């Protein structure tokens, strides 16, 4: 249909509508006009059928078959205008509805797009989360495996270290055992368990120190000065010993450092320092242990620890203890002579008289307590402990000495009481019933006598009663 020939029927298309259809559907202007004209014809036909006016004659008509009457022209024009307006409205409504539908489609499409975009983002985020979770899990697994490997490595390293420590400890035990066996064999061959020969051997060690160590050092001023410097380090440290294991280890390390410095300086200096240490132990025993016997244990432990690192110290310390206290062997000398009294451990006072027996007993018990503590703290010395105690009991008994030499009998009672207090429990623990027989013998009536003899005899009887009650021996334990 030609749009130029029907200006009243066709309205001018809105440029915005044309633009929107063109952009949305990809149609050009000619396509839109074709669509528009087709729809317009249909609507005009529908409207013309609906609003078709009834034919009325505006004025009376005389029938004549050859006459054709038309309605007035102004009515026809008005009707065409009215119909054109209605059609225009319908067209605009149709276009508006089409725009609404299109907008709704766009909105729905946008919503769908947004949903898909959100879902895509959600899926991507979930995928990333799972990826991160997997990486984290792998990292944790790797870290766990690493820690487990490290733990296993540390355990293996600790096991290796413990095995090495056990091996070294066993080697030390074996070496110590072999050394003790060799020493025991040497002692058996040398001493033949004869107290007098043991005493002579100890005195020979003292004589050797005097002639081969002390005398040469005295002639060398430089070495002598060095020895006196080391001397000032040893004495105060012995006074600092307590029952604390940590303090004992500290003092032992300081003393060993002093010994090592002396060893590095000169072999004679080393032996001189060891000899002075033994002298200091004796003085400490006379001053402190004589008053407080339980303090013998810490001092004895320091001596034992140092003996493990200084092979010459054991025999030298034994010789020094025996020189000042012959009861450690034990062996008696003829104390009726000045030389015999000196060898029995008596001290001569400045006025030329010998010390009183009470003072002598206290000093002898202090020195003997240190020796008994050494025997009790080291189980490998149990044979020596048994031999020492049995030798004491093989001496003339206190009941015999009560009539012949009461002071000597009192000293013997004090020494036996000291052994029972310090080393009795150790002997009983190692030798059991046999040790119990020996202990009971030491305070029996046959050995001690029923009564009399003074305070020393009485104390040994009280000690025996405590042992019979199962309460014998001093109660002592080291602290951390």
Curated annotation (Swiss-Prot):
Q: Which domain of life is it from?
A: Eukaryota
In residue numbers, the region (Disordered) covers: 128-196
- Provide the GO biological process annotations: poly(A)+ mRNA export from nucleus; protein transport
Organism name: Schizosaccharomyces pombe (strain 972 / ATCC 24843)
Q: What is this protein called?
A: mRNA export factor gle1
What subunit structure does UniProt give? Component of the nuclear pore complex (NPC). NPC constitutes the exclusive means of nucleocytoplasmic transport. NPCs allow the passive diffusion of ions and small molecules and the active, nuclear transport receptor-mediated bidirectional transport of macromolecules such as proteins, RNAs, ribonucleoparticles (RNPs), and ribosomal subunits across the nuclear envelope.
Member of which family? Belongs to the GLE1 family.
Name the job this protein performs: Functions as a component of the nuclear pore complex (NPC). NPC components, collectively referred to as nucleoporins (NUPs), can play the role of both NPC structural components and of docking or interaction partners for transiently associated nuclear transport factors. It is specifically involved in a terminal step of poly(A)+ mRNA transport through the NPC.
- Which Pfam families does the UniProt entry name for this protein? GLE1
Residue ranges with Basic and acidic residues bias = 128-193
Q: Which UniProt keywords apply?
A: Coiled coil, Cytoplasm, Membrane, mRNA transport, Nuclear pore complex, Nucleus, Protein transport, Translocation, Transport
Residues annotated as coiled-coil are 91-190
């Amino acid at each position: 249909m030609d749009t130029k020939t029907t200006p009243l029927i066709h309205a001018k298309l809105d440029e915005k509508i044309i633009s929107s259809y063109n952009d949305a559907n990809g149609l050009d202007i000619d396509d839109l006009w074709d669509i528009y004209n087709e729809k317009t014809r249909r609507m005009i036909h529908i409207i013309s059928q609906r609003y078709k006016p009834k034919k009325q004659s505006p004025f009376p008509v005389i029938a004549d078959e050859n006459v054709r009457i038309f309605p007035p022209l102004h009515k026809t024009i008005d009707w065409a205008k009215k119909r054109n307006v209605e059609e225009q409205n319908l067209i605009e409504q149709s276009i508006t509805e089409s725009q609404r539908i299109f907008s709704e489609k766009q909105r729905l499409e946008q919503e769908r797009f947004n949903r898909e975009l959100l879902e895509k983002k959600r899926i991507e985020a979930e995928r990333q989360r799972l990826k991160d979770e997997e990486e984290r899990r792998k990292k944790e697994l790797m870290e766990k495996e690493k820690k487990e490997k490290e733990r296993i490595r540390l355990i293996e390293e600790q096991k290796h270290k413990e095995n090495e420590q056990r091996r070294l400890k066993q080697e030390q035990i074996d070496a110590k055992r072999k050394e003790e066996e060799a020493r025991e064999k040497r002692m058996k061959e040398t001493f033949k368990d004869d107290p007098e020969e043991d005493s002579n051997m100890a005195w020979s060690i003292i004589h050797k120190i005097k002639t081969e160590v002390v005398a040469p050092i005295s002639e060398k001023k430089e070495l002598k000065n060095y020895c006196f410097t080391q001397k000032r380090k040893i004495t105060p440290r012995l006074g600092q010993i307590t029952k604390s294991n940590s303090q004992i280890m500290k003092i032992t390390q300081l003393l060993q450092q002093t010994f090592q410095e002396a060893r590095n300086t000169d072999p004679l200096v080393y032996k001189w320092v060891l000899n002075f240490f033994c002298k200091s132990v004796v003085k400490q025993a006379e001053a402190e242990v004589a008053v407080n016997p339980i303090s013998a244990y810490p001092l004895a432990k320091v001596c034992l620890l140092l003996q493990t690192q200084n092979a010459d110290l054991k025999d030298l310390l034994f010789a020094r203890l025996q020189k000042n206290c012959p009861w450690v062997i034990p062996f008696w000398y003829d104390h009726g002579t000045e030389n015999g009294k000196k060898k029995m451990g008596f001290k001569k006072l400045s006025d030329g008289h010998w010390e009183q027996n009470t003072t002598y007993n206290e000093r002898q018990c202090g020195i003997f307590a240190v020796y008994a503590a050494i025997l009790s703290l080291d189980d490998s010395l149990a044979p020596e402990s048994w031999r020492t105690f049995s030798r004491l009991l093989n001496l003339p008994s206190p009941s015999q000495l009560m009539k012949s030499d009461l002071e000597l009998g009192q000293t013997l009672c004090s020494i036996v009481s000291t052994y029972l207090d310090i080393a009795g429990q150790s002997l009983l623990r190692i030798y059991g019933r046999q040790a119990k027989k020996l202990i009971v013998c030491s305070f029996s009536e046959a050995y001690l006598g029923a009564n009399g003899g003074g305070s020393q005899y009485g104390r040994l009887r009280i000690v025996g009663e405590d042992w019979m009650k199962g309460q014998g021996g001093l109660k002592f334990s080291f602290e951390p």
